[in-house]
Amino acid sequence: MRAAAAAAAAAAAAAAAAALVHLRRRRRLMHACPPEWWLALRSQPEWLPMRVREWEDAAWRASSGWVGVDFVHGASAAVRVLEYVFKSDEPLQVVGAAHFRNGAESHKGLCHGGSMCALMDDIIGWTGFCVSGECVPWSGFTVQVNTRLSVPVPVGAWLKVEAQVERCEGKRKVWIRSKLSDPNDGTVHCTAEGLFLRSAEANARGTA
């Protein structure tokens, strides 16, 4: 009797362990796959994908002088944006799906607030690169980002990050507003305003 009971208990424990492994694998798969809202937006023809070679081609990136991986778009990024799409109608808008991965964790189960700040910096910069109506990487730089953190982000979350041009001053200053939110329930996790400064070289090339 005892042997049979022990065997049954061992079998039950093994089944529970197998179920837990399956659940964890399923969660990892769900977390790794872009959400439906992003796939639906991405398929709309008015949204143009940014084609940025240094995000997509690690070998080319290394051979072109970069010494590491992209902080937000690299394969090992703690908060990763696979790509941005943009709409050049006024006001210019940029949208992406941000995956907050395990490496962004600070408080148990929650991501570090700095991960949201880094994301705001990134999308404000890339919105500035698109201000000419086409994506021109490294045609300027972000000089100011004011971020307000509202709601913590749980580890594993996929959130919508978006930005739009608010106004331009002269030929170089571009003021941009951005937001991080959950399209599923409308929760706004943070907002930001930033100043992007277009390079003198970009203006000289006539991309104003």
Where are these regions (language model features)?
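Catalytic strand-loop segment that frames the active site of acyl-thioester-processing enzymes
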Residues: W60-C111
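Hydrophobic alpha-helical topogenic segments used for membrane insertion/localization
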Residues: R2-H22
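HotDog/MaoC-like acyl-thioester-processing domains
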Residues: A15-R61, V153-V155, K160, E166-A208
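Short amphipathic alpha-helical face segments that pack within enzyme cores
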Residues: S115-I123
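Histidine-centered catalytic micro-motifs
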Residues: G109-S115, T147
